[in-house]
Amino acid sequence: MSNLFKDMLKDSESLFKNPIALDYDYQPKLIPYRDNEQHYIASCIKPLLQDRNGKNLFIFGKPGIGKTVATKHVLQDLEENEGEIQQIYINCWKKDTPYKVVLEICEQVGYKWTQQKKTDELFQKAKEILNKTSTIFVLDEVDKLQDTSIIYSIVEDIYKKTILLITNEKDWINTIDNRLISRLIPEFLEFKPYNQEETKGILKQRVQYAFNQNVFEEKAFNQIAEKTFELQDIRTGLFLLKESALIAENKSLKKIKLEYSEEAIKKLATFTPKDKKHLQEDEKQILALIKDNSGKSIKDLYGIYSLNNNLAYRTFQKKIKQLETAKQITLKDHKDGWGYYKTVELGNLKTLKDY
């Protein structure tokens, strides 16, 4: 007699072995297809091992193609083999002012007496600690900094260092002061998108880390790999792997079928790689305003926002641009009798037909 329940999950069973392996910040033991980039990053750090000043590096490329994870892998390798070099990692999306950056540096070097001290005072204390050794500074999402003076301070006042600037925005380097560029003298490293074979290989590696054996039907996995390559963002693929597995688990099934990957792809219309918890309070307020007024122009939105908030129009425009970069909103260009203007809509404008 056939077992009608052999393909059903029991209460204690799960498709997942290690779901953390599908998180965007997860650090795999091996970073495939980025050996050349990691060696280049390491070469900029190498002079620090010889008690000399390191090279500064501007790292750029599209979102979700391994810039941060490859950099962190190099730092992890350095920590395991050369633990005497101080490492400072700052995400400038979260720490976007000189004060916030310096406060984070103080925390990472173990200086705790930060209350009622100004930015310059805090940096002076951090400098005294950092100049006793060599330091690697990683400023991730550096384009989110509201003020680049902190980079200038690091360049001028920290003796032996390597500064790694990471951004999705290739042209950001052209927006900073020439005086800073002349002191940074950065080298440039572009992370190019993964090709189709590499994309499939990365997702296959994550499947091995995250799931029990043989849970994905080949057609379902291939469809996810194809969609990920099309969108050129590995984070999208991780979302699809996780979502399709959750759909199968909700049905108590042991196999992830093509229909579940298709259902997961439909959910991409509401998916944003940048979690809203990373937004600042004013950005959350602006996002809530857009939700209630989707389709209005930036000028009209500012008119509503400024009724209860004190924020310059130029700063408001910058916040709108940051939300667009984070894929929380979409800007659309329009033209009327008075010229060009932009309207703002919530989330990703792609419809299910686009998928």
Kindly give the residue locations of the regions a language model identified.
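Short amphipathic alpha-helical interface segments
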Residues: Q280-G303
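A short, basic N-terminal segment
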Residues: M1-G54
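Mid-core helix/loop region of P-loop NTP-binding domains shared across ATPases and GTPases
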Residues: L9-F16, A21-D23, T71, L75, ...
